[in-house]
A protein has these predicted regions:
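Conserved PLP cofactor-binding pocket of PLP-dependent enzymes
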Residues: 103-125
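Aromatic-enriched alpha-helical interface/lid elements that frame and gate functional surfaces
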Residues: 34-105, 109
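Beta-rich nucleic-acid/ligand-interaction surfaces
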Residues: 2-4, 78, 117-121
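Active-site-adjacent "lid/gating" segments in soluble enzymes
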Residues: 1-50
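Flexible, small-/acidic-enriched active-site or ligand-binding loops
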Residues: 129-174
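Short, glycine-/Ser/Thr-/acidic-enriched flexible segments
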Residues: 53, 117, 150
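Short, surface-exposed loop/helix-turn segments at secondary-structure junctions
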Residues: 14-24, 121-133
Length: 174
C-alpha cells in the first residue's frame, strides 16, 4: 500500500495526460537530459536532477557548455541529442572529479554511491544516516522525531540462522 502511494504524483501526471506509459519518454524517467544518470570516465555514475532554471543554468556553467541548443531545456524533440552530448561530457572525467566540481553547487548533481561508499560519504556521516551494529552497517531509522528516539533493536540475521527455530514453529522437516 505504501509503495503505491509513492506513485501518486505519477498517476496524477498520467491521468492529466502529461505522462506517457512508456519507459524513458517522460520528464522524470530518464528521457530528459537534465534528469538522468550518466556514466563517468571511471565507470562510476553521477546523478543529474536540474529541473529548475537556476539549477539547469548552474549545471551548464559548471560543465562549461555554451551550445545554444541547451537553452531549449524543455524541447523534448532535442532531448536525445542533448542527452548524448551530456553523456560525452560526463565521460571526460571520473565521478569523483565531477563530485568535486559540483560539491558546493546548487546544480543538483551528485555522485551515485555504492553500498560501501554511502556510509562513508561526508554528508551521510554528518547526518548520522548510517550506523554499525554487530559488524553490520545499516541505515538509521527515519524519519527522526525530536521527542521519540528511534533505535535499531537487532542486526539482520544471516541466511539460515533461524531455520531450525522457524521449522520447529511451523512443524516443517528440514
Amino acid at each position: 500500500d505504501g509503495t503505491s502511494m509513492l506513485m501518486s504524483l505519477f498517476y496524477s501526471f498520467y491521468g492529466s495526460g502529461v505522462w506517457a506509459n512508456e519507459r524513458e519518454s517522460n520528464l522524470l524517467d530518464g528521457a530528459a537530459h537534465f534528469y538522468d544518470t550518466y556514466e563517468c570516465k571511471d565507470g562510476k555514475y553521477i546523478a543529474v536532477a536540474c529541473i529548475e532554471d537556476k539549477f539547469y543554468k548552474e549545471m551548464l556553467d559548471k560543465l562549461e557548455i555554451t551550445d545554444e541548443k541547451f537553452s531549449k531545456q524543455f524541447s523534448k524533440d532535442i532531448w536525445p541529442e542533448l542527452k548524448s552530448k551530456l553523456g560525452e561530457k560526463f565521460l571526460s572525467k571520473n565521478r569523483d572529479e565531477w563530485a568535486m566540481i559540483f560539491k558546493n553547487s546548487d546544480a543538483c548533481i551528485t555522485p551515485i554511491l555504492d553500498l560501501d561508499e554511502a556510509p562513508k560519504h561526508e554528508h551521510n556521516k554528518s547526518r548520522s544516516t548510517f550506523t554499525e551494529r554487530d559488524g553490520v552497517v545499516q541505515p538509521n531509522p527515519s524519519p527522526r522525531f525530536s521527542e521519540t528516539p528511534l533505535e535499531i533493536k537487532s542486526s539482520p540475521k544471516k541466511i539460515g540462522e533461524d531455520n531450525i527455530l522457524i521449522s520447529e514453529k511451523y512443524n516443517i522437516n528440514l
